A protein has these predicted regions:
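Conserved SAM-binding loop of SAM-dependent methyltransferases across substrates and taxa
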Residues: 255-268
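Non-catalytic accessory regions of SAM-dependent methyltransferases
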Residues: 1-141
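Mobile active-site "lid"/loop adjacent to the S-adenosyl-L-methionine
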Residues: 318-347
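Conserved SAM-binding motif I beta-strand of class I
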Residues: 269-274
Length: 419
């Protein structure tokens, strides 16, 4: 096959050479393509407007000087014009497309097997970080000993390999059932329709998994994103070490998983708070699953208002967990997000007993570690408390960070002692 060659504008290759996997539409200068019997050269804009290279085709990326950078999938409907899938030339991929994908799935799965057992639930594939752009795969091991997979195809670069991916997942992971959750808005930016539902054999939409000895109900069809936030699994286990005999406040609790890990560790009392009534009902279900009703209580409230109210009432805690949703999903909103993160941290510090533990998280790539720890320092100053950072964590082992692709390093989790 004769694959089109996309040449970047001068200087635009730097990030890709450093490991970045996207080429944006405004970074591409010209394209060489094979038209009938000969190679032709045309401006990128002309290629797009005249459809000379079709969406979903594999193309090769070159620097302006002609240095080969990698092969990827083209999509004219997205600002991300090419998502790189290989450092090899395109013909290497298409000599054995099924084998190409099978190896990637095997590599990703075997990496997780170093840390997780057959009875664990974990992320098998973390899109670009596993060199499978746009593909997310979660593996859930249910209480009734069945393997469920939840898959997301969020980019055309994943969609074009759909059949090969599903075949590889069946062979490598041998799931009882696979549920597709390609229902995120980002698919529309890729020119793709949203999809969800069972792929082949049907299973139970709601299952129970065991995490760190805690029973958790996971709604595969309606739960947030892919059903459950597996990225905090190891952080929840680590935080539990500080909770024995303590009064714990778990804010933005969602499923109540942090609070229930605290309960499992022997917490004296736990309050799980969330503004979403739906989240509170999920937390209540999980509390009942674990027989924790006497220790773990729920509150449906705006966390900002709740922290103010607790401060006004003079209520104190030994451990406070702040695990908010992303306060910013764009670089433009970082300043506003900084204020939000600072306020909840400042107020949490004020209602901690001396020597209390603050667990504080941010899950936005745009709010990087420098901004996060700067915010934490300013919150400590304004709360007139001295703060000792005991541990710094990111996402669990199943969410690797790809150097050169900073979006894969999105989670900050700090365990702090507040004097």
């Amino acid at each position: 096959m004769d694959f089109a060659r996309f040449f970047l504008k001068k200087g635009e290759e730097r990030e890709i050479r450093q490991g970045f996997l996207w080429a944006f539409d405004n970074e591409i200068e010209r394209v060489k393509f094979f038209d009938e019997k000969e190679w032709k050269d045309a401006p990128f804009a002309e290629i797009v407007s005249e459809g000379k290279v079709k969406d979903g085709e594999c193309v090769e990326i070159f620097s302006s000087a002609g240095g080969f950078l990698g092969s990827g999938i083209f999509n004219s409907k997205s600002k991300i014009a090419v998502r790189i899938v290989s450092d090899s030339h395109a013909n290497k991929i298409f000599e054995d497309k099924a084998g190409f994908i099978f190896k990637k799935i095997c590599d990703a799965y075997n990496l997780r097997r170093i840390h997780f057992s057959d009875e664990d639930s974990f992320r098998v594939c973390f899109d670009e970080a596993d060199l499978l752009p746009g593909l997310t795969v979660e593996r859930y091991f249910s209480e009734d000993k069945k393997i469920y997979l939840v898959v997301q195809f969020l980019a055309l670069a994943a969609e074009v390999f759909r059949n090969e991916i599903l075949s590889a997942l069946e062979k490598v992971l041998k799931p009882f059932a696979i549920y597709e959750r390609s229902d995120a808005d980002v698919r529309e930016k890729e020119g793709l329709e949203k999809k969800s539902g069972w792929l082949g054999r049907r299973g139970k939409e709601e299952i129970v998994i065991l995490e760190n000895g805690v029973r958790i109900s996971v709604d595969l069809a309606r739960g947030q994103k892919t059903g459950y936030f597996l990225d905090q699994k190891l952080n929840r286990a680590e935080i539990a070490r500080y909770c024995h005999g303590k009064n714990v406040l778990d804010t933005f609790c969602h499923t109540g998983a942090f609070g229930l890990n605290a309960f499992k560790a022997g917490a004296k009392s736990v309050i799980c708070a969330d503004i979403s009534s739906e989240a509170v009902e999920i937390a209540k279900k999980n509390i009942e699953l674990n027989g924790a009703e006497k220790i773990v209580k729920t509150v449906c409230a705006d966390v900002f208002e709740l922290l103010r109210q607790y401060e006004s009432d003079g209520k104190k805690f030994d451990v406070i967990i702040l695990d908010p949703p992303a306060f910013t999903k764009s670089a433009r909103a970082v300043k506003k997000a900084y204020g939000g993160y600072k306020e909840i941290n400042l107020r949490a510090m004020r209602i901690l007993n001396p020597g209390g533990i603050l667990v504080t998280c941010s899950c936005s790539y745009f709010f990087d570690p420098n901004a996060f720890y700067s915010m934490l320092a300013n919150a400590a100053t304004d709360s007139h408390r001295r703060v000792q950072v005991l541990q710094k964590h990111g996402a669990s082992f199943d969410h690797p960070v790809l150097l050169g692709y900073p979006r894969s390093e999105y989670l900050c989790c700090a365990i702090c002692k507040v004097f």
